[in-house]
Regions:
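Hydrophobic, well-ordered beta-alpha structural blocks that scaffold small-molecule cofactor pockets
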Residues: 4-58, 63-64
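Residue-level detector of alpha-helix initiation sites
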Residues: 35-37, 95, 141
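Alpha-helix C-terminal capping/helix-to-coil transition sites in glycosyltransferase folds
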Residues: 26, 82-83, 130
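E1/E1-like adenylate-forming module used to activate ubiquitin-like modifiers
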Residues: 113-162
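ADP-ribose/adenylate-binding Rossmann-like module
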Residues: 86-90, 97-123
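An accessory alpha-helical subdomain
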Residues: 141-227
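Glycine-rich, highly charged phosphate/nucleotide-binding loops
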Residues: 67-82
């Protein structure tokens, strides 16, 4: 994966956002805000298993209807945020969002501040999900419209069958890791399995897959025996 540095004349070097994927299962997330912006963030986070608490004086009915989250209709006290792994500031007031962002940064808490990427320690990407296959798209906060268009383009390119293919490849990768000692041969074997699937509309037939793996098992064993 490549980290790209972009030069901005007069401002020195700015680093593009690194696309790091985080396991959110069971993570405590506090969303401050009860409107449409907060709703979009909540829907994104909830899919990935986060434990979400929403704090706002007024919370929209759509958020209240979401199962599995805690809703507190009150003003937020900053010290409550210390209990969170991640904080999302998505109120309608920029001054409150900025206050939350500054507090979280001072406390070392990951925070996303609506409409303020300078205060945000992470951004919400446009997401395409096919089971365990997750693709995120971001323009570094420059243009949500561009990010949305690219997300939709990629979404059309990736068929639903990739969900099953990804899970199958996970199982075959485990087999290859155990039975093919050569990293180079193992990579060749797994690449060939994907090519076989793509030639068959993303369907990986078990019989064909085992035939491919058996070929590489034998080649790997022969190489080791000759040493």
């Amino acid at each position: 994966m490549q980290i790209i540095y972009l030069y901005s004349e007069g401002d020195g070097w700015d680093m593009a956002y690194f696309p790091m994927y985080i396991n959110l299962e069971g993570k405590k997330v506090i969303v401050v805000g009860g409107g449409k912006a907060a709703l979009r963030k909540i829907n994104s986070l909830l899919y990935f298993g986060a434990k979400i608490a929403v704090i706002a004086p007024k919370v929209c009915d759509e958020i209240k209807a979401i199962k599995g989250i805690n809703v507190h209709e009150s003003n937020v006290a900053l010290d409550i945020l210390q209990n969170a792994d991640i904080v999302v500031a998505a109120t309608r007031r920029a001054d409150i969002n900025d206050k939350i962002g500054n507090y979280c940064k001072a406390q070392g808490i990951m925070v996303n501040v609506a409409d303020n990427r300078e205060l945000s320690s992470f951004l919400f990407p446009g997401v395409i999900v096919r089971g365990d296959l997750v693709v995120g798209v971001t323009t570094g906060g420059n243009s949500q419209a561009v990010s949305k268009q690219i997300r939709n383009m990629i979404d059309r390119m990736i068929p639903e069958e990739y969900d099953v293919l990804t899970r199958k490849m996970g199982a075959y990768t485990e087999l290859a890791n155990v039975n093919i000692k050569s990293p180079a041969l193992r990579e060749e074997a797994l690449d060939e399995l994907v090519k076989v699937a793509l030639s068959n509309k993303c369907v990986l037939d078990d019989k064909k897959a085992n035939k491919v793996l058996d070929k590489y098992y034998r080649e790997d064993a022969a190489r080791r025996n000759s040493q």
